[in-house]
């Protein structure tokens, strides 16, 4: 499992065909990729790591606070292309990405785990498998990759 974590001033997701829109401010936009073979243990590891990453500045302007410490918001977006491989040719392959059934289940479990960790009122999410318009206004920028397996 792979999470691309971005500290943001604001973020949003719009799904025009679903008439769906969510927005956050001062927090994290997290793009989540699920790999073939991932399990609930991967969900727990990555979710806990992302909820406790100290990527927000303290009073000394040092990255020393977590999203929980700053009462930040998180926008979670499923992104199978995080496992895109472009080593051969010019068109990426996605054979490492989990099949939709597994990925959807683990994506929903990830959201559930983050809500338990941070509080559901601060968590927003995209819709698995939907074509989305994602708005990200980075803060820093600060971008961290969290993986459950090397």
Region spans (language model):
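N-terminal, polar/charged subdomain of small-to-medium soluble alpha/beta proteins
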Residues: 1-93, 101, 105-150
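S-adenosyl-L-methionine-dependent methyltransferase catalytic core, i.e., the SAM/SAH-binding region
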Residues: 97
């Amino acid at each position: 499992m792979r999470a691309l974590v971005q500290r943001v001033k604001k973020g949003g997701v719009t799904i025009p065909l679903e008439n769906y829109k969510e927005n956050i401010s001062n927090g994290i936009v997290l793009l989540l990729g699920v790999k073939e073979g991932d399990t609930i243990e991967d969900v727990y590891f990555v979710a806990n790591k992302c909820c406790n990453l100290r990527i927000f500045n303290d009073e000394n302007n040092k990255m020393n606070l977590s999203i929980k410490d700053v009462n930040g918001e998180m926008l979670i977006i499923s992104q199978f292309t995080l496992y895109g491989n472009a080593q051969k040719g010019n068109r990426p392959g996605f054979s490492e990405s989990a099949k939709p059934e597994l990925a959807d289940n683990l994506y929903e479990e990830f959201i559930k785990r983050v809500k338990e960790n941070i509080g559901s009122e601060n968590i927003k999410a995209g819709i698995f498998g939907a074509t989305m318009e994602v708005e990200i206004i980075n803060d820093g920028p600060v971008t961290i990759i969290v993986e459950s397996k090397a």
